Design a protein with these regions (language model features):
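Acidic, polar ligand-binding/catalytic clefts
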Residues: 25-38, 88-119, 230, 235-289
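Extended ligand-binding regions for polar small-molecule ligands
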Residues: 22, 47-49, 115-165, 222-231, ...
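Positively charged n-region of N-terminal signal peptides that target proteins for export
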Residues: 1-7
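Bacterial Sec-exported substrate-binding components of ABC uptake systems
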Residues: 26-35, 155-182
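C-terminal motif of bacterial Sec signal peptides marking the signal peptidase cleavage site
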Residues: 16-20
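Conserved beta-strand scaffold positions in the cores of enzyme catalytic domains, especially
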Residues: 21-22, 63-65, 103, 175-176, ...
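Extracytoplasmic small-molecule ligand-binding "clamshell" domains
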Residues: 37, 42-45, 51, 56-78, ...
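Alpha-helical transmembrane segments
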Residues: 11-15
């Protein structure tokens, strides 16, 4: 009887410890061929994004949301989730930096999530009614699809070691010597590589983050923002905001625009005006090998 009681006590303690550590039954999804194969898995996505909404397309999935991609990555590594939704370029960036990670290469509207171009594309956001939308649309239209793709490939490579010299001319650039038309204040997270990230030097064309000493922003969004500002004859200033504060920043006039890997969803279009998309991507799921 004493042995039974002791065994039960040990089992109870083990269960308590498992619960305290966020223990759960993990699901191996490494062989998933489509999102239907994720049934029963615990999948994360960033709060307030289409990624999170898209998880409702999977029957029986356990959905978890986190404030940013650093939290998602930490949750995956700790075992709190089996995977998390990201754009394909983000997956390439993350997995290139950590050989323990991989991703499920789903294709939108095929093996992957059902989504429109607006839901999986990224665009620049302006305050509702801004006449800048039409102007910037004309600039975006000048950028060929091949250039957009080449720039993203460069940013994935550059993001692996942001402060090291990148001895290659970027696919997208413009003369920024003329800034007679004022300042273009652009907000982004500066924490969503390869779209935008923070580094400690101005290497490879990084832009100083306003209000942050010795911190610089770089990435795909930064390159596009630099191009737009140069074509407008404006000086570019980059501001770092938490994701949930980006729209409020442009609504209040604290910044002029958002370039933050943000998709022009119906909900967001009720709050701000978007340009045409300057990049489109498949949604994939990052996992541990």
């Amino acid at each position: 009887m004493k042995k039974l009681v002791s065994f039960l006590a040990v089992a109870a303690c083990a269960a308590m410890l498992l619960t305290a550590c966020g223990g759960r039954e993990k699901k191996d999804i490494s062989g998933a061929q489509s999102i239907a194969d994720l049934k029963g898995a615990t999948i994360g996505a960033q709060t307030g994004t289409f990624h999170l909404e898209a998880l409702d397309q999977i029957d029986g999935v356990v959905k978890k949301d986190y404030p940013d991609f650093t939290d998602l990555l930490n949750a995956l590594k700790s075992g709190a989730i089996d995977g998390y939704v990201a754009e394909e370029p983000t997956a390439f960036d993350v997995c290139s930096k950590d050989e323990t990670l991989s991703f499920l290469p789903f294709v939108n509207n095929d093996t992957g999530f059902t989504a429109t171009d607006a839901e999986t594309g990224i665009a620049v956001a302006f305050k509702t009614g801004s006449d800048m939308v039409e102007t910037v649309n004309a600039i975006i239209a000048e950028i060929p699809a091949e250039t957009r793709s080449a720039l993203m490939q460069q940013m994935v490579t550059l993001g692996a070691d942001p402060d090291a010299a990148f001895n290659e001319e970027l696919a997208l650039s413009a003369d920024a010597s003329e800034v007679a038309n004022g300042t273009l204040k652009v907000a982004m997270e500066c924490a969503y590589a390869p779209f935008n990230w923070t580094q400690t030097t101005d290497a490879n064309g990084a832009v100083a983050i306003s209000g942050k000493d010795n911190l610089y922003a770089n990435g795909y969004d930064v390159a596009v923002a630099k191009y737009i500002a140069a074509r407008l004859g404006m000086k570019l200033e980059v501001y770092s905001y938490e994701w949930d504060s980006l729209i409020a920043a442009v609504q209040s006039g604290a910044v002029d625009a958002i370039a933050a890997g943000m998709s022009p969803t119906d909900e967001r279009e009720e709050q701000v005006d978007f340009t045409d998309c300057y990049y489109n991507s498949n949604l994939v799921v990052i996992i541990k090998k």
